[in-house]
Regions:
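Bacterial Sec-pathway N-terminal export signals of envelope proteins
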Residues: 21-77, 83, 116, 233-277, ...
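Transmembrane beta-barrel architecture of outer-membrane proteins
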Residues: 106-108, 154, 199, 290, ...
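Sec-dependent N-terminal signal peptides
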Residues: 4-13
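Amphipathic alpha-helical coiled-coil segments
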Residues: 49-64, 144, 148-167, 178, ...
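Periplasmic alpha-helical coiled-coil/stalk elements that build and connect Gram-negative outer-membrane
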Residues: 21, 31, 144-258, 358-361, ...
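Small/polar, glycine/serine/threonine/aspartate-rich low-complexity segments that form flexible
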Residues: 23-28, 75-115, 238-252, 281, ...
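A glycine-/polar-enriched beta->alpha junction
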Residues: 38-48, 55-70, 99, 103, ...
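Acidic, low-complexity, intrinsically disordered peripheral segments
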Residues: 6-7, 22-27, 33-34, 82, ...
C-alpha cells in the first residue's frame, strides 16, 4: 500500500498541470482590456513556443561552456583467451597424443582526463555567440508578446463594436415596430392607405434580418476574442466598454524615434548580427593550434587488480591543411553577416513604413470621428422630423424609412470610426514597440 501511495504521489508531481477555462475566467465575469491581455500572455501557445526557444538557447550556452571543463572518461574491459589444441605425436597403437594449454583471462580498466588549456579563445567566442543568441531569442519572445497584445486589442474592440452595432440594430427594430403600429392605426381609421402598412412591414422585416446578422457578428467576435486569449472554451463573460474616443497625441518623428529605439525585431536582428560577427572570428580561429593537457590511469592483468600505471602530458594540435575547410567556413560566416546587414536595413525600412501608415490611419480616423458624431446628431433630427410629419399626416412612409435607415447607418459608421481609431492607436503603439 505504501508503494502505491508513493507511485501516485510521483505521478501527480510529474504530470502536467491542466487548467480548465473556468479556472481562468469565471462565468459572468467582467473582463477589462488589461485582464484580457494578461490572460493571453499566460495562455497563448505562440508565447509558450517563443519561451521554449529561449530555453533552447540557454541549453546551447551550457553546451558551449562545457569546453571550459575537463573531459573525463572511463573504460572497463574483460577478455577470455582459449588457445587451440595441438598434437604432440602418436602412441604405439597409432593414437594421436594431444596436449592443451590452460585458458586465461585479461582485465583492463582505464580512466582518462583531458583539459583544453588554450584554444585562442574559441570556447569564449562560442559562449559569447550563445549569449547573443539568448538575447536575440528574448527579443523574439517580446516581439511575439507585442503581436499577441495587438491581436487581443483588435479582438476586444471588435466585440465592443459588435455589441454597439447590435444595440443599433435592436433600436432600429423597435423604431420600425412603432412605425408599423402607427401605420396600422392610421389605416384602420382610414387616414392612410394599405401601402403604408405593407411598407412598414417590409421595413420591420429588413430590420429584423439586420438584427440577426448583428447577433451573429457578435458571436463571431466573441469566439475570435476567446481564440486570441488562448482560452477557446471560455465560459460566458462580459467585457468593459472603453470604446469611447480619447485623443492620442504624438508626433510622427517622435513615433519613428520610439520605434527605432524600442522595436524588439530591430534589437533581435542587432544581436544576431553581433553573433554572426563573432562567428566570423570563430571561423578564423580554425587557423590556430589548440593546446590540451591530458592524464590517464590504468589497470591491466590476468587478475583484478594487477598491474597499474599512469600517464600525463600535453598535446598541441596544429592545423596544417584541411582541404580549405577553414577558409570556406570564414567565407560562409562573412556572407551570413552581409545577409543580416541587408536584412537589418530592410527591417528598418519596414518599421518606418509601419509607423507612417499607422500614424496616418490614426490621424485620418481622428479627423473623421467628429464628422461621424455630427452625422448621428443630424440623422436623429431627421428621424424626429419624419416621424412628426408622418404623425401630422403631411409626410409619407418613405421619409420615415429613409430617416431611420440613415440613423442606423450613421450610428454604425460612428461605431466603425471609434473601433478603427482604437485599433489604429494599438497598431501605432505596436509599431513603436510600446504597450
Amino acid at each position: 500500500m505504501k508503494r502505491l501511495y508513493f507511485f501516485l504521489a510521483v505521478l501527480i508531481m510529474v504530470s502536467p498541470v491542466v487548467v480548465s477555462a473556468e479556472e481562468i475566467i469565471q462565468k459572468g465575469e467582467i473582463l477589462t482590456l488589461e485582464r484580457c491581455v494578461a490572460i493571453a500572455l499566460r495562455q497563448q501557445p505562440s508565447i509558450l513556443a517563443a519561451q521554449g526557444n529561449v530555453d533552447v538557447y540557454y541549453a546551447k550556452k551550457g553546451q558551449a561552456e562545457s569546453g571550459y571543463y575537463p573531459q573525463i572518461d572511463a573504460s572497463l574491459g574483460y577478455s577470455r583467451f582459449q588457445p587451440s589444441t595441438v598434437s604432440t605425436g602418436t602412441t604405439t597403437v597409432g593414437i594421436s597424443r594431444i596436449s592443451t594449454s590452460h585458458s586465461f583471462e585479461q582485465y583492463a580498466t582505464n580512466v582518462t582526463a583531458s583539459q583544453t588549456i588554450f584554444d585562442f579563445w574559441k570556447t569564449k567566442t562560442q559562449v559569447n555567440i550563445a549569449k547573443l543568441n539568448i538575447d536575440s531569442s528574448k527579443e523574439d519572445l517580446r516581439s511575439t508578446e507585442e503581436q499577441v497584445i495587438l491581436d487581443v486589442k483588435q479582438a476586444y474592440y471588435a466585440v465592443l463594436e459588435a455589441q454597439r452595432n447590435l444595440e443599433v440594430a435592436g433600436e432600429t427594430v423597435k423604431q420600425f415596430q412603432q412605425h408599423l403600429e402607427q401605420a396600422k392605426a392610421f389605416y384602420e381609421v382610414g387616414t392612410r392607405p394599405k401601402f403604408d402598412v405593407t411598407n412598414a412591414e417590409v421595413d420591420l422585416g429588413n430590420a429584423r434580418l439586420a438584427l440577426i446578422r448583428a447577433e451573429n457578428s457578435l458571436k463571431v467576435a466573441k469566439v475570435t476574442l476567446n481564440n486570441k486569449l488562448g482560452v477557446p472554451e471560455a465560459p460566458e463573460y462580459e467585457i468593459e466598454d472603453n470604446l469611447s474616443f480619447v485623443k492620442y497625441s504624438i508626433g510622427l518623428q517622435e513615433a519613428i524615434d520610439k520605434a527605432y529605439e524600442n522595436r524588439p525585431e530591430l534589437k533581435s536582428i542587432a544581436f544576431k548580427k553581433k553573433a554572426t560577427e563573432n562567428s566570423v572570428s570563430l571561423a578564423k580561429k580554425g587557423y590556430f593550434p589548440v593546446l590540451t593537457g591530458n592524464a590517464g590511469y590504468s589497470w591491466a592483468g590476468h587478475e583484478f587488480p594487477e598491474g597499474d600505471g599512469w600517464d600525463a602530458g600535453l598535446s598541441l594540435s596544429i592545423p596544417i591543411f584541411n582541404g580549405f575547410l577553414t577558409k570556406s567556413q570564414v567565407s560562409e560566416a562573412r556572407a551570413n553577416l552581409l545577409v543580416l546587414t541587408a536584412n537589418e536595413e530592410t527591417l528598418r525600412q519596414s518599421v518606418l513604413l509601419e509607423v507612417q501608415q499607422s500614424f496616418l490611419n490614426l490621424t485620418d480616423l481622428e479627423a473623421g470621428i467628429p464628422v461621424a458624431e455630427l452625422t448621428v446628431k443630424m440623422a436623429q433630427e431627421n428621424v424626429e422630423i419624419a416621424d412628426g410629419r408622418y404623425a401630422a399626416g403631411v409626410g409619407n412612409p418613405i421619409e420615415v424609412t429613409d430617416a431611420n435607415v440613415g440613423l442606423s447607418n450613421a450610428r454604425t459608421t460612428l461605431n466603425q470610426a471609434l473601433y478603427g481609431y482604437k485599433v489604429a492607436r494599438a497598431s501605432l503603439e505596436k509599431a513603436m514597440g510600446i504597450r
